[in-house]
Amino acid sequence: AFIILSAGFGEETHEGALLEERILATVNTYGASLIGPNCIGLMNTWHHSVFSQPIPQLSLQGVDLISSSGATAVFILESAVTKGLQFNSVWSVGNAKQIGVEDVLEYMDNTFDPEKDSRIKLLYIESIGDPDRLLFHASSLIKKGCKIAAIKAGSSESGSRAASSHTGAIASSDSA
């Protein structure tokens, strides 16, 4: 698995987008997974690949956060930790070149263990590659007893411009 934290790819220039495509082709050639670029990484109770602050104490009783934006994930962490909210996992997918919010939600659905996994999922979404898959796995998790709170950014014209300049997210369907 690869996590590319740095920015300066498809969200900034055409050359950056071409570099993203080359990276994705290499990752796919070797059957690897890619989170990012332009993200803060991921952390859970057994693995930490986040290189920003704050890093909260993680708890199996905490919530799962999936964010398109690393900056928004950090803002949520800073705000929540001071109020005592605990996290089980934090996933930042950034430009989501290979793995997007719906992929992480699918993973959480497919591996859900009611004895060990959080029943609360927080989603901050700038783009959705496959709205139907997101809805399928969100519905499945709800049937398993989970609660999901989601914010879809970039719905207005100005919000769409902000999301595009931030993570390179192209305005996607808000149907989910």
Description of each model-found segment:
Residues 1-176:
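Catalytic-core regions of core metabolic enzymes
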